[in-house]
Amino acid sequence: MTARKIFVTTALPYANGNFHIGHIMEYIQADTWVRAQRMQGNAVNFVGADDAHGAPIMIAAEKAGKTPQQFVADIAAGRKQYLDGFHIAFDNWSNTDSPENHELSQQIYLDLKAAGFIETRTIEQFFDPEKNMFLPDRFIKGECPRCHAKDQYGDNCEVCSSVYAPTDLINPYSALSGAKPVLKTSEHFFFKLSDPRAVEFLTEWTQNGQHVQPEVAAKIKEWFGTRTNPDGTTSEGLDDWDISRDAPYFGIEIPDAPGKYFYVWLDAPVGYLASLKNLLNKRGEDYDAYMADPQLEQYHFIGKDIITFHTLFWPAMLKFSGRKTPTKICVHGFMTVNNGEKMSKSRGTGLDPLKYLALGMNPEWLRYYLGAKLNGKNEDIDFNPEDFMARVNSDLIGKYVNIASRAAGFIFKRFGGKLGEVSADGQALLAQLREQAGPIVAAYEARDTARAVRETMLLCDRVNSYVDANKPWELAKQEGMEARLQDVCTTCIEAFRILTIYLKPILPQVAAEVARFLIVPPEQFAEVAQPLGAGHQIGQYQHLMQRVTQEQLDALFEPPAPAVEKVIPGGEEIAPTITIDDFAKVDLRIAKIVKCEAVEGSTKLLRLTLDAGEGQTRNVFSGIASMYKPEDLQGKLTVMVANLAPRKMKFGLSEGMVLAASHADEKAHPGIFVLEPFPGAQPGMRIH
């Protein structure tokens, strides 16, 4: 059988935060499928990337005082601990700001334009009058025009999955300032999804039963025809897709339109191809030749919240730019906790991946539990702590791991680690195990790991029944039963090897440890049929896995301590610590305001004539005119910096500085307050 050639991706995480458990679930699902493919001898390239573009990244980077590129790089630096921690083995990890993605995105756009799928239109676009910028979709919120759900984003509804223009929102508001946005005109670029060629292609591609799950196809079908919304209104057909955004924007510039950028959802999926190209470039392989192979299969694992982009826009972009369309879009549901409850850290129902690892919880417990739940459909799966403990302790350890511990010691101690011959009853049992190789591999192919786990656990039950019936611990006590003891224990070890192969895509670390114990190279599915044989030497068994404890689960779901809001006095952080010698360099003196007058041509400054006990006065300008009238200050005592170098200003020479206090946020906390010493202080006195 010819090896398959497969290209696999997961959805790109947005590079503005850490991975959450939904990311980890998807990556484990895809990683398991990739491992199962490789165990059949198939050649797989498994790539990921950070989704690096868009206004949210730009704004977050600005707040952090970083460039968008540095902000994304800092987020990406934290990815490895998650991926390594849960044994998720991508072949490459890139980001959508890579040179490869710039090149591919721009070329795909030009190819679509040449095919007649791009047109420009002057549109009305929301503009934030307070922030003085056009608002990206994700910074506009309002009521969905289709189902009327509240607080939906400006590009798609998370309730009914509709995609629309931001101007379609009802009662929109800026998510940045809360202001009501105003409409301004701008020229935008559209991908003509309503073109009859696109409609014909997408109708066939999504409904032919080959590329998406049946339940996903049924949902997509609604978008092609007339839809009745919950409020009784109707919507019809596919809309053209606005693929451009106005500067300022962090993204890929449209090649023939300076100041215009691709909407993030255009270049994000192209990032799949770009990460693959980056990988192949590193290997010195030809990307174009790889993608041109008609036997190449292309799989995308995604969540059900981004079906629209991956089943309409993405295949149409690829098709009409002359590229290969995806073989399959593999859609999964969300993860809930405790029988459907949404995750919330504050309520103690959040599952933090890093906390899980920090508590010393085995990553393969979670891989196994998710494997036992995921079934290839886009159904939500629930993490129930009691169910988790039962499946790990009773099934994974009690049924599977313990098989080896019940037999390995006898082989090592009584027979020098050498396996023996297997008699007829053992051969019959092993034959039953080998017969399930086809169905289990088929379950992995269908991403129905729940069925693969279920079938494997049923086989574990058969093996444990064999152990209970033959009682090797009693055989070991009986004279003349050495051959039978070696026979039974050899059968158990061979059965354990087969079961380990079946679980290897889900439990790669356990499988590696079992391979070391059995002294065999990493095994493929085909090697289920090839027994170790009499005389094979095995090593000493080491315990493979601890049981999960209630204390670990309690700690995992313990709500975090209430956050104590950091107090920032006056709206500004305290300055870095200085020494007494540093402070002594500043000469602060009591000064009397002999004269105070407004400055002609300035609304902010007052001119102060100060007596600092020097036998002569000083001229000082101070920006306090908004708070004080000249007559209010004349004759008052204040504090001045006496050794500040004179500064030449537009209105004259300033020979010092008067000290005054104000809040950092003058808009929220207006006011400037000149310092005034207690009675008794005299001009010229130094402040220590």
From Swiss-Prot:
Cellular component GO terms held in the UniProt record: cytosol
Annotated ranges, domain tRNA-binding: 582-688
Annotated disulfide bonds: none
Reaction(s) the record says it catalyses: tRNA(Met) + L-methionine + ATP = L-methionyl-tRNA(Met) + AMP + diphosphate
EC number: 6.1.1.10
Molecular function terms, GO-annotated: ATP binding; metal ion binding; methionine-tRNA ligase activity; tRNA binding
PROSITE patterns given in the database record: AA_TRNA_LIGASE_I, TRBD
Textual note on the cofactor: Binds 1 zinc ion per subunit.
Alphabetically ordered keywords of this record: Aminoacyl-tRNA synthetase, ATP-binding, Cytoplasm, Ligase, Metal-binding, Nucleotide-binding, Protein biosynthesis, RNA-binding, tRNA-binding, Zinc
Cell location: Cytoplasm
Binding site for Zn(2+): C144, C147, C157, C160
InterPro entries tied to this protein: aa-tRNA-synth_I_CS, Anticodon_Met, Met-tRNA-synth_bsu_C, Met-tRNA_ligase_1, Met-tRNA_synth, Methionyl/Leucyl_tRNA_Synth, MetRS_core, MetRS_Zn
UniProt short sequence motif 'HIGH' region, positions renumbered to this chain: 13-23
Cofactor dependence: Zn(2+)
NCBIfam families: metG, metG_C_term, PRK00133.1
Function noted in UniProt: Is required not only for elongation of protein synthesis but also for the initiation of all mRNA translation through initiator tRNA(fMet) aminoacylation.
UniProt record similarity statement: Belongs to the class-I aminoacyl-tRNA synthetase family. MetG type 1 subfamily.
Quaternary structure note: Homodimer.
Protein name from the UniProt record: Methionine--tRNA ligase
Native source organism of the sequence: Acidovorax ebreus (strain TPSY)
